[in-house]
Structures are given as structure tokens and as C-alpha cells.
A protein has these predicted regions:
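Extended, subdomain-level signal for the structured scaffold at the beginning of enzyme domains
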Residues: 1-111, 123-135
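General beta-strand structural signal in soluble alpha/beta enzymes
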Residues: 35, 115-118
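Conserved small/polar residues in nucleotide/adenosyl-binding loops
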Residues: 137-139
Length: 139
């Protein structure tokens, strides 16, 4: 199978593991991943978050590592991508209301291209009318 080009949507304080591990795994099997964040340019830094279970009833949240996005958000043409992935963490809590992010997700939905998400990333899909329907989402 030829490598695909995947668009990853992130926001400030997206979960570090859900960015780094996904990106590395996709590269390992021959895919290209362009990571974008609204209002950021290629090379700009976003802060990530780390969640850990430290013996409490729920996880703790800590500052993660800096991450350099590798594509300018304003330059994204969804027609250039085979799939979209929405990382989780805190990022989706605010990028889900960005009309440009919603338009990107809507494109993938309407063209039948794969949409992947993990954890809080599903908030982005829920924010786009018609993408998540009862009995049709596989989470």
C-alpha cells in the first residue's frame, strides 16, 4: 500500500502522547502526517499536556513538551489529504468551535474520507452537525 497523507488537528495543550505516538506510528508504516493548529504556522510551537495516573481516583494533568507544528494552518487544502486525525487532550475543547476546523472535518465527512479521533478529540466531531449520529459513530 502506498503511503497516505494524513492531516492531524491539534490545539494548545492537546495530549502529548496522542500527538507524538500517532505521528511516529504513521511514519513507521510509511504515511506522511501534517500537524496543524489554528492560527499557527509551520515551525510554531504549541504546548502539550501530559496526563498520568498517580494513585488518585482520576488522572493528573501536567505541562508536556513543546511541539513544533509542521504545516501552516492557513495553507491546508483538505483535498490534499487522505484522512484526518483529531488528537485529544485539552486542545479540542477550544478548537472545536473554530469554524475553519469544523469546515475541514465537514469536508472529510462529506467526501467519505476516514476520520480518526481519540479521547477528547471526539468533541471536534460532535461540534460539526451531521458528523456524529446515533448508531453511526464507532468510538
Amino acid at each position: 500500500m502506498a503511503g497516505k497523507t494524513i492531516l492531524m488537528l491539534v490545539g494548545e495543550f492537546s495530549e502529548e502522547y496522542e500527538i507524538f505516538v500517532f505521528e511516529q506510528a504513521m511514519h513507521a508504516v510509511g504515511h506522511t502526517v501534517h500537524v496543524v493548529c489554528p492560527d499557527k504556522k509551520a515551525g510554531d510551537v504549541i504546548k502539550t499536556s501530559l496526563h498520568d495516573f498517580e494513585g488518585n481516583q482520576t488522572y493528573t494533568e501536567k505541562l508536556g513538551h513543546d511541539y513544533h507544528v509542521n504545516k501552516t494552518f492557513a495553507d491546508v487544502d483538505p483535498a490534499d489529504y487522505d484522512a484526518v486525525y483529531c488528537a485529544g487532550g485539552r486542545g479540542p475543547e477550544y478548537i472545536r468551535i473554530d469554524k475553519r476546523v469544523q469546515a475541514l472535518v465537514r469536508h472529510f465527512h462529506e467526501t467519505g474520507k476516514p476520520i480518526f479521533t481519540i479521547c477528547h478529540g471526539v468533541q471536534i466531531l460532535i461540534a460539526v452537525d451531521g458528523v456524529v449520529q446515533i448508531g453511526r459513530a464507532h468510538v
